[in-house]
Amino acid sequence: PHGTTTVITDPHEIANVMGTDGIDYMFQATEGLPIDVRFMLPSCVPATPMDESGANLDYRAIDSFYDYPRVQGLAEMMNSYGVIHNDPEVVSKIVAAQAHHKKIDGHAPDLQGNDLNAYIAAGVYSDHECSDIEDALAKLRRGQFIMIREGTAARNLEALAPLLCGKYIERCMFCTDDKLSL
């Protein structure tokens, strides 16, 4: 095979509309494909408490999905405020992922200082929201992995390329994050 052999997806958009039925659909639709499709479970459905969506997924709604062999962990924890301030629902989602020995991806643009320390100490493993080298280095020095993003809207490879020549190269990876297929 040539090209992409594996993708890791976060079905939060379909979950916002269809709830767990949407996640089930994604699993069924990707079964047996000639590409390995893995999943991170959506951490924020709806994305914010003010959003009106087709579903509200608490930690109980996603917990049973951790038993699926293609589930890698909890997708981009966008509610950094909830992590830092110990929101019970956010903490429950993190604890559930950890209980299943799964990774927790981050989403914390420009988080700094003690807030960043608390976010990472909660178990958030990686981040794909670094737009400059200083933000990436702050997270790397605290133990996070950095996903260097080249998506349709956000492109950070040029700004973060120096990381690929330094001592943190083994803690860096690439991601697309919302890439249009055209």
Model segments located where?
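Divalent-metal coordination cores built from histidine and acidic residues
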Residues: 2-103
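Short beta-alpha connecting loops at secondary-structure transitions
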Residues: 10-11, 174-181
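Glycine-rich beta-alpha junction loops
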Residues: 43-45, 152-153, 178-180
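Histidine/acidic residue-rich metal-binding segments in metalloenzymes
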Residues: 56-76, 82-148, 152-174
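Short secondary-structure boundary segments
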Residues: 98-100, 179-182
